[in-house]
Amino acid sequence: MPPKDIRLSMLKRSTLLPLIRACAAEVVGTYLLVIFGIGAVASAVLTGAQSGLWQVAVVWGFGITIAIYVTAAVSGAHLNPAVSLTFAIFRHREFPYTRLLPYWTSQLTGAVLAGLTVLWLYGPFITRFEAENGLVRGASGSQRSAMVFGEYFPNPGLFGTGPDAQSLISPFGAAIVEAFGTAIMLLVIFALVDRRNASLPNKYLSPFFIGFTVAVLISLFSPLTQAGWNPARDFGPRLVAYFAGWGSIAIPGPSGGFWAYIVGPLVGGPIGAAVYEFLVRPGLGDRIPVGSQSADDEDNPPTIPLS
């Protein structure tokens, strides 16, 4: 038998390697989610190729679905700090708090990389858009180009950037909208990953329904806040915009309200999960759909069950 210190070293390596792989998957998955999403926003804002909120929302939804299918079997496909926090609170045996920081870092990394990619690909189109519309990057009004990366309230593409528009919704109001949308999203996710829910569709369809839910939420609330529901999705590309010349228009934003896209989802996610855990799940009893795994395995799923 190897010495104790060698056994401990082997144990550390055996537990560290799966975490490294999970974090790598979170980087890839978040990158895919954000590149699809802000790519659609860039296409709509800069070229008019996507006409209407629903078209952009559908691309976001499919981006989420694809990212989940790609990464769920490795990392659980959180792809969102609000999702990770919520699972750490309510499924801590499967997703302990010690994983939060590595997951959050990975998600932010993927989002930053996606933002850099869009800046690289669409850079000339952004410059042309600003010139055609008389926008000075980093000055008041340049939210109309910065919205490709971060999010603003109300939606600059619909309401403009003047004082009248800014008076429609406050930073606190934006945080409430973000919390509300994220709560609904997590409520749906918790219902879809709970195989004691006899009304579940085939487990392999769960990513599709999650993506569809997000698409619907975006179509409903994007006029208000651009519908983030994901701190990494907003803050990662927003950092890119900050260093690419938008400065204070990106952070802290024209109303100083960039925090709404971080605090809102982190508060709303656990609220949505709590609604499911304490109001819906107790009514399920011990009913387990035919074809599911055992109750012991399903009591605390880490997230999207695809394997």
Indicate where each model-derived feature is located.
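Membrane-interface helix-loop junctions and terminal tails of multi-pass membrane proteins
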Residues: M1-S307
